[in-house]
């Protein structure tokens, strides 16, 4: 099976903004750095954090349907190459936000304006039954962690390793990468 050049997607679209004070690339790099600091050697969790918004880089900008379904689309994009856990976390990081909004009013009040808008597009807080079903999944805690890093990874002053630091991890799952800049 041919690989997926993730770095080419970041090079082509990673410098775009998505309503926050950082670019898509910076957001992904901050998420990966947060996951790496918290999870140590859990490469699957770091990979999910790095790629949780990959679908934004693979579809035309300005499409609300992309915002609503980007978790599912991102998971489908990476699923042929990564362990099921990574794809599940990517797929459910939006549901994790919807879960937190349903169970934690403080979390909801702390969302950025862009996240509040995307929450509405994504269907709002989860219903009780859906929240309970999600919470029962064995990888639920991982999706919550990625969600929290997703919320935190919006600091325009943050210093992170460059994308090139993650190329060995990407190549382990996706094959050769063609990164031309750090």
Q: Model-derived features: where do they sit?
A:
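Metal-dependent phosphohydrolase cores
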Residues: 1-182
């Amino acid at each position: 099976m041919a690989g997926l050049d993730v770095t080419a997607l970041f090079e082509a679209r990673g410098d775009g903004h998505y309503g926050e004070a950082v670019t898509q690339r910076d957001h992904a790099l901050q998420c990966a750095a947060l996951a790496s600091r918290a999870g140590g050697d859990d490469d699957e969790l770091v990979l999910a954090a790095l790629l949780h918004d990959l679908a934004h880089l693979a579809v035309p900008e300005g499409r609300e349907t992309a915002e609503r379904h980007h978790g599912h689309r991102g998971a489908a994009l990476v699923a042929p190459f990564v362990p099921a856990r990574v794809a599940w976390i990517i797929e459910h990081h939006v549901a994790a936000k919807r879960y937190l909004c349903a169970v934690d009013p403080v979390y909801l009040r702390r969302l950025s304006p862009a996240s509040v808008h995307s929450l509405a597009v994504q269907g709002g807080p989860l219903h009780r039954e859906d929240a309970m079903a999600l919470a029962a999944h064995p990888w639920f805690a991982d999706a919550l962690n990625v969600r929290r890093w997703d919320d935190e990874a919006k600091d325009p002053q943050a210093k992170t390793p460059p994308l090139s630091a993650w190329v060995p991890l990407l190549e382990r799952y996706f094959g050769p990468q063609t990164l031309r800049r750090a």
